[in-house]
Curated annotation (Swiss-Prot):
This is Large ribosomal subunit protein bL32. SUPFAM superfamilies: Zn-binding ribosomal proteins. Belongs to the bacterial ribosomal protein bL32 family. InterPro entries: Ribosomal_bL32, Ribosomal_bL32_bact, Ribosomal_zn-bd. It comes from Borrelia turicatae (strain 91E135). One of its GO terms (cellular component) is large ribosomal subunit.
């Protein structure tokens, strides 16, 4: 049976476990054109704008 040759250091163990402790990035941000919540880095589904440029023609 395989046995570790050296004891893993605290730094290595904690670095490996730290992936589960990362903070969640907010998935939504306010649209700069209409103020509606929109998914980050995507066109707003309400107005069709992204970064102050219109990308979709929405017939409202």
């Amino acid at each position: 049976m395989a046995v570790p040759k050296f004891k893993p250091s605290k730094s290595r163990s904690r670095t490996r476990r730290s992936i589960n402790m990362r903070k969640k990035i907010p998935q939504f941000q306010e649209c700069s054109n209409c103020g509606n919540l929109a998914v980050r880095h995507r066109v707003c589904v309400k107005c069709g704008y992204y970064r102050n440029s219109q990308y979709l023609e929405l017939g409202l």
